Amino acid sequence: MLVSGTGSLLQNIIDNQDDSYRVIKVVADKPCPGINRAQDAGIDTEVVLLGSDRAQWNKDLVAAVGTADVVVSAGFMKILGPEFLASFEGRTINTHPALLPSFPGAHGVRDALAYGVKVTGSTVHFVDAGVDTGRIIAQRAVEIEAEDDEASLHERIKSVERELIVQVLRAANVQDQQLIIEI
């Protein structure tokens, strides 16, 4: 698991572990509450700070993640480089608070509201070299209500996101270093 912030999605993933998946390590790009949540759950943690050499940071990140079958970017706010993506190709997934390919990037909820769409949602997708451009694994829609602002809509999307990521992880299978998900 990769985290950068509060770790609320991470906590949901930890709380819903069963025989289908286990969180074995949490790696962050800075000290953050997500690391504390993992430590409280008895999960191995590591912080890999981004220095001036981004290529070295990616190598250090690969070493920190180790032998994980699946890497989940759960609120991780850094772009993963070629070294990392090559090491975990086809096995790194991300959640996004919009129905991709619409509204990629860090402000998906705000952008959906500004555009005036009536429906947005949550997407789980594979991570590739682009920003939120990887192959879509699963999506779930959330209707935008007249009284929604960015915060209220984001909370409703997070609720759906938490269910969706657990569904995806429970359906995940790794075969020949490739992540297969049958939902």
Protein language model regions, located:
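One-carbon transfer enzymes
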Residues: 1-183
